[in-house]
């Protein structure tokens, strides 16, 4: 029997090891109260039905864990046959200090805030975040990979109303079950729940449940399980047709090559988006003649090394539920799928004929299917893009494994890729992440080595924000690995990376909330000869203040082996050779709740065979809740005295956000890049009649700040392109 007992103890230990804690350590699920009586969602939670709901016990999360909140808060959550309700009584001893920095829809901007997080499938990995400010501005996000990924471009149907009095501010929220999706067994659903209140000017946050700061309060794994009984979801069909018109013009050289003439086009487009929940857990989207006219222009960048720049996806159709399609191969390995490959060629829009998407859950599996087709235009062939992604929990509530397949096809050319991945919580805060992928082209030689067409990524990390955290990883990418539907910054390399922090909370200090020294060593080797191609080695001290600011100071050493000369910012050449150089970086940030704030990033030191001095300033002024003025200015001074060359590079960005109220808003983005001598202008005005019904006016223009002479002796036109677009979309619910 002793051997049996030892076997049982060993099995129990293994289960505890894999689950990251003692067996049976989960709290008993909390039965959520059912609303008895009528509630009007008007921001005045004074109905008797609310008083019958017990308030949730709240704990200070920041600035001092388990400290005494300075402002009184009550939060109640309940449900009825069709909705989840939440109400907050956010008392404030200084109502004039309540932060309302912006009325801009879908944007938290350092305001006071109330948020409710729901993990509808109770998988401890994914959640839906619904937040509102004292002005009633709503923002929502999808949380995935246990808080590692936040997607703020997701939109759904729900309500939030607020009021402000001399006592503070008050909120009511109503979330339809149809906007959640959940699994119900015999009419019973178990979800994860977290609620928070933020007093922005004090950087004070309270939460339910109590959450240790070594975790992020947005992690679904720290939510409290709740139980709803006698519930079921509905499955409405949403249809969103749109109509678009406008004027587009661009200069072209006349046939006699003596002058530029203006070509004009008047687009007239209609299209349709359909969304239907096939089940309470699985949603189907169909898009016909997909349009992205209202998308904000890309933030311009200056390439200061020899590897490809990464531009994030800004198109809402692809951002929505994009987390299911994430397959990231570490900081150097790129992505197996990057949706910017669809409908964009070198940043220029390509018409998208349409496509379909299926996302959600089928049993224990997270599922994502995407198929999109682009139109042939300007010498580019029509293309088809396909993606299939599956993922499911394994071993314990905090681990998952999955697979992905992608395809890109055009005119007989095909590229296929597939990959396998796993994220495993080994014990405590330690996780093992594994990724492996392989690509094939139609014309690929059968003699290509297995590893040459493959890429793998192995990462062991302690994901802690208290005490010691660390991350050790390696990535290897073969010379013939080429994901045509993804993003790959460099090819044929192997990395060995390590990074570590030690988080020290300073609860008794009047200024600092935590201080965390750290170090990193990133090394990238060429597979062809094993030589170190790039190396970064650094130590730093970083800090967060109780007021919400922070910063760090970081000396860093670089090693670079350049085989072929390249241009920095398209203006200065770096010759082939081996280089060792170093710099010092200082970053200072101010609390996001300040109406006038600025961040600074400054660095100076040697750079390849010369020197670099750089400063980045990002000021923001919330002049009123109706107007935000923000900007970025990056100045880089490069000098290579031994070669008697250098450059001053300027990148400036001015962004204006204006809102009359929660429905009417405008956005202006002006960007200047000295490496291209271009000024890009983007204006967008939106009127939101109702959720899903919008009118957009968009103006885009690119101006030449330096008009060069061409071969015919003509100066470049002042306006390189101009477009004015009017778009209306309306959502019908059936």
PLM segments and residue spans:
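Bacterial N-terminal signal peptides
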Residues: 8-19
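Extended, hydrophobic alpha-helical segments in both membrane/secreted and soluble proteins
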Residues: 241, 268-274, 282, 288, ...
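N-terminal secretory signal peptides that target proteins for export/translocation
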Residues: 1-5
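Short loop/turn motifs that connect adjacent beta-strands in outer-membrane beta-barrel proteins
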Residues: 181-189, 229-237, 276, 281, ...
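Structural preference for beta-rich elements and adjacent junctions enriched in aromatics
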Residues: 25-392, 402
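Exposed, low-structure sequence patches enriched in small/polar residues
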Residues: 351, 435-734
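Conserved short loop/turn motifs at secondary-structure junctions
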Residues: 259-260, 271-273, 288-293, 373-376, ...
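Beta-propeller domains
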Residues: 376-391, 395-458, 464
């Amino acid at each position: 029997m002793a051997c049996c007992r030892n076997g049982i103890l060993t099995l129990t230990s293994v289960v505890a090891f894999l689950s990251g804690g003692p067996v049976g350590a989960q709290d008993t699920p909390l039965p959520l109260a059912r609303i008895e009586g009528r509630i009007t969602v008007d921001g005045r939670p004074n109905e008797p039905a609310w008083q019958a709901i017990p308030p949730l016990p709240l704990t200070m999360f920041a600035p001092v864990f388990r400290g005494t909140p300075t402002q009184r808060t009550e939060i109640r959550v309940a449900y009825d046959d069709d909705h989840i309700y939440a109400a907050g009584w956010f008392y404030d001893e200084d109502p004039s200090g309540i932060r309302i920095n912006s009325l801009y829809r879908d944007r938290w901007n350092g305001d006071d805030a109330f948020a409710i997080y729901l993990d509808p499938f109770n998988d401890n990995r994914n959640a839906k975040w619904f937040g509102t400010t004292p002005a009633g501005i709503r923002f929502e996000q999808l949380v995935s990979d246990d808080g590692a990924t936040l997607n703020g471009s997701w939109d759904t149907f729900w309500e939030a109303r607020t009021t402000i009095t001399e006592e503070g501010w008050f909120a009511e929220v109503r979330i339809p079950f149809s906007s959640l999706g959940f699994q119900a067994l015999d009419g019973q659903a178990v979800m994860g729940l977290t609620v928070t209140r933020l007093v922005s000017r004090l950087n004070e946050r309270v939460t339910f449940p109590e959450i240790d700061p070594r975790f992020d309060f947005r992690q679904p794994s720290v939510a409290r399980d709740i139980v709803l009984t006698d519930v079921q979801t509905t499955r409405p069909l949403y249809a969103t047709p749109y109509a678009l018109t406008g004027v587009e013009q661009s200069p072209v050289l006349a046939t006699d090559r003596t002058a530029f003439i203006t070509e004009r086009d008047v687009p007239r487009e209609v299209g349709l988006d359909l969304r239907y929940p096939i089940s309470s857990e699985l949603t189907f989207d169909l898009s016909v003649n997909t349009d992205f006219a209202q998308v904000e222009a890309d933030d311009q960048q200056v390439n200061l090394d020899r590897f490809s720049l990464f531009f994030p996806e800004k198109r809402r159709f692809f951002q929505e539920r994009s987390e299911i399609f994430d397959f990231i191969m570490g900081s150097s390995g790129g992505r197996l799928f990057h949706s910017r490959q669809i409908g964009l060629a070198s940043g220029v829009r390509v018409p998208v004929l349409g496509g379909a998407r299926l996302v959600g859950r089928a049993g224990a599996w997270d599922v994502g299917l995407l198929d999109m087709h682009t139109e042939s235009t300007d010498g580019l062939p029509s293309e088809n893009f396909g993606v299939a992604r599956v993922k499911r929990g394994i071993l314990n509530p905090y681990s998952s494994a999955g697979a992905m397949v992608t395809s890109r096809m055009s005119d007989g050319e095909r590229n296929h890729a597939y990959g396998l991945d796993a994220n495993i919580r080994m014990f405590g805060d330690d996780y093992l992440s594994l990724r492996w992928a392989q690509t094939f082209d139609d014309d690929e030689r059968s003699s290509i080595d297995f590893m040459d067409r493959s890429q793998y990524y192995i990462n062991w990390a302690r994901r802690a924000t208290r005490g010691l955290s660390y991350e050790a990883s390696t990535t290897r990418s073969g010379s013939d690995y080429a994901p045509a539907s993804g993003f790959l910054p460099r090819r044929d390399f192997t990395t060995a990376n390590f990074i570590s922090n030690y988080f020290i909370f300073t609860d008794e200090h009047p200024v600092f909330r935590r201080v965390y020294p750290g170090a990193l060593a990133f090394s990238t080797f060429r597979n062809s000869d094993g030589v170190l191609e790039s190396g970064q080695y650094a130590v730093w001290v970083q800090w967060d203040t109780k007021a919400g600011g922070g910063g760090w100071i970081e000396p860093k050493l670089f090693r670079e082996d350049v085989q072929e000369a390249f241009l920095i910012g398209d203006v200065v050449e770096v010759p082939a050779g081996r280089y060792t150089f170093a710099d010092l970086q200082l970053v200072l940030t101010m609390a996001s709740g300040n109406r006038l704030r600025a961040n600074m990033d400054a660095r100076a030191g040697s750079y390849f065979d010369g020197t670099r001095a750089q400063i980045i300033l990002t000021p923001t002024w919330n002049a009123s809740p109706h107007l935000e003025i923000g900007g970025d200015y990056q100045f880089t001074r490069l000098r290579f005295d031994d070669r008697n060359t250098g450059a001053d590079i300027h990148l400036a960005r001015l962004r204006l956000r204006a809102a009359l109220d929660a429905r009417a808003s405008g956005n202006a983005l002006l960007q200047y890049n000295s490496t291209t001598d271009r000024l890009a202008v983007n204006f967008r005005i939106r009127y939101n009649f109702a959720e899903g019904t919008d009118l957009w006016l968009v103006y885009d223009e690119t101006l030449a700040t330096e008009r060069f002479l061409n071969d015919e002796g003509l100066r470049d036109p002042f306006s390189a392109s101009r477009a004015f677009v009017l778009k209306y979309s309306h959502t019908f619910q059936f």
